[in-house]
């Protein structure tokens, strides 16, 4: 019975060191070519609350919404 508890404690200590955990936890956006196009569009058109488009998921989502609202036919 003690082995699973010890194993869980070891895993909890190691997990923050893993690269995948850090990416998930930080919620940072890796800005690829498409992301860069959206962010440049938002910068050029002074979209509000998208200043951190390249690094913040929430700002990036706002930028995509701004882009689609202004560029998709209705």
Swiss-Prot record:
<dbReference type="GO" id="GO:0099106">
    <property type="term" value="F:ion channel regulator activity"/>
</dbReference>
<comment type="function">
    <text>Acts as a neurotoxin by inhibiting an ion channel.</text>
</comment>
<comment type="similarity">
    <text>Belongs to the conopeptide P-like superfamily.</text>
</comment>
<keyword id="KW-1015">Disulfide bond</keyword>
<dbReference type="GO" id="GO:0090729">
    <property type="term" value="F:toxin activity"/>
</dbReference>
<feature type="signal peptide">
    <location>
        <begin position="1"/>
        <end position="20"/>
    </location>
</feature>
<keyword id="KW-0732">Signal</keyword>
<keyword id="KW-0800">Toxin</keyword>
<keyword id="KW-0964">Secreted</keyword>
<protein>
    <recommendedName>
        <fullName>Turripeptide OL135</fullName>
    </recommendedName>
</protein>
<keyword id="KW-0528">Neurotoxin</keyword>
<dbReference type="GO" id="GO:0005576">
    <property type="term" value="C:extracellular region"/>
</dbReference>
<feature type="propeptide">
    <location>
        <begin position="21"/>
        <end position="28"/>
    </location>
</feature>
<keyword id="KW-0872">Ion channel impairing toxin</keyword>
